[in-house]
């Protein structure tokens, strides 16, 4: 098994972890139904950019 030669410093550990942060989801409110949904996605009611695109 591999064993490290030298201990990594707090600085190097922080530099490695700097890209691990999670981003919040970009949400939008539909103009027609007022429903909250993910950006660039159809709402649960089937609306996209104010128009009905899916019939349930």
Swiss-Prot record:
Signal peptide: none annotated. Keywords: Ribonucleoprotein, Ribosomal protein. One of its GO terms (biological process) is translation. Residues 1-28 are annotated as: Disordered. One of its GO terms (cellular component) is large ribosomal subunit. InterPro entries: Ribosomal_bL32 (IPR002677), Ribosomal_bL32_bact (IPR044957), Ribosomal_zn-bd (IPR011332). Residues 7-16 have a biased composition (Basic residues). It comes from the Bacteria. One of its GO terms (molecular function) is structural constituent of ribosome. The keyword Aminoacyl-tRNA synthetase does not apply. Belongs to the bacterial ribosomal protein bL32 family. This is Large ribosomal subunit protein bL32. It comes from Vibrio vulnificus (strain YJ016).
